[in-house]
A protein has these predicted regions:
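Conserved beta-loop-beta/alpha segment of the NTase-like Rossmann-fold superfamily
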Residues: 66-170
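N-terminal glycine-rich phosphate-binding loop and ensuing alpha1 helix
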Residues: 2-68, 72
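Catalytic-core segments of class I nucleotidyltransferases/pyrophosphorylases
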Residues: 126-127, 134, 139-147, 159-162, ...
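Short, flexible hinge/linker loops that cap or flank conserved catalytic cores
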Residues: 2-5, 25, 92, 120, ...
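Conserved beta-strand scaffold positions in the cores of enzyme catalytic domains, especially
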Residues: 31, 98-100, 153, 224-226, ...
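Well-ordered alpha-helical segments embedded in enzymatic catalytic cores
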Residues: 39-42, 112-115, 214
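Residues at the starts of beta-strands that form the adenosine-phosphate
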Residues: 9, 53-55, 125, 150-153, ...
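Generic beta-sheet signal
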Residues: 13, 34, 58, 101-103, ...
């Protein structure tokens, strides 16, 4: 099945506090520059390059910084933004369509997603990503998994290296030492696609969390599938992570273009 990617909105979860990041200025983590562009823009540009052009930001913490950035006339011109108003969704297929709204500073991820449905009335399929993870996902391959009639959701999995050396022991003797081996079970790196209908088939409690409660409920129903990603995967959790990615970029100015 061939899908028109421009009709698939992408929700970017960028309203959290990012407490481990320890921002050196008053900007939220997602607006920290990782190249010539902020983190969130590199993520948006990757999606845009791959055919998506509608992005929804349910804002919360430091929302004024995001609003200031996206409404800046220079940024609108530089990135070809088309800023959408919730009362007048006039899309421009040649531009990056951005819609943001205040989802509440204390809203968790799952609540933020549900609050986006106000703007997804005629949408059956949408994507979700985090505002601090880079990966060169092949989205068309990932989306093809939704052709399975039992699939209602797809997430990207990744075999990451352990941060520690692993040892095999017998009778207190070390038989084998593996320096930072690949972890056998893939980790969830986000980059989701959902059929909207599944959100109305799952019983949700008010305080339920996206990863802790909602995804396990999908798994129990056997409707959550995963796409194994074998390319890049970089997460910005701390200033050290940001410095590492900046170093990669400074070594190769085309780093993000190759993603």
């Amino acid at each position: 099945m061939t899908r028109n990617l421009k009709k698939i909105p992408i929700i970017i979860l960028a309203g959290g506090k990012g407490e481990r990041f320890e921002s050196k200025d008053d900007l939220p983590k997602q607006l920290a520059k990782v190249s010539n562009h902020p983190i969130i823009i590199e993520i948006i540009l990757y999606y845009f390059k791959n055919g998506f052009n509608f992005f929804i930001l349910p804002l919360g913490y430091r929302k004024k910084s995001f609003i200031k950035f996206f409404l800046n006339k220079n940024n609108i011109k530089k990135y070809k933004f088309n800023i959408l108003k919730d009362t007048n969704l006039k899309f421009d297929n040649a531009k990056i369509n951005i819609l943001f709204f205040d989802a509440g500073i204390n809203s968790n991820k799952l609540s933020r997603i549900y609050k986006c449905f106000k703007y997804l009335k005629n949408v059956n399929l949408f994507g979700v990503c985090y505002g601090d993870i880079f990966a060169n996902i092949i989205f068309k391959k990932q989306l093809s998994l939704l052709n399975n009639k039992n699939a209602s959701a797809i997430l990207a999995g990744y075999n990451e290296n352990s941060p520690f050396g692993h040892i095999k022991v017998k009778n207190n003797k070390i038989l084998r030492f593996n320096e930072k081996p690949k972890i056998k079970e893939p980790i969830n790196i986000g980059f989701y696609f959902f059929k909207k209908e599944i959100f109305f088939k799952i019983k949700i409690r008010k305080k339920d969390d996206f990863e802790t409660n909602f995804l396990p409920k999908l798994s129990k129903r056997k409707v959550l599938f995963y796409h194994m990603h074998n390319g890049y995967h970089l997460t910005v959790t701390t200033q050290k992570d940001l410095a590492h990615i900046k170093k990669l970029y400074n070594k190769n100015k085309n780093f993000f273009k190759k993603l």
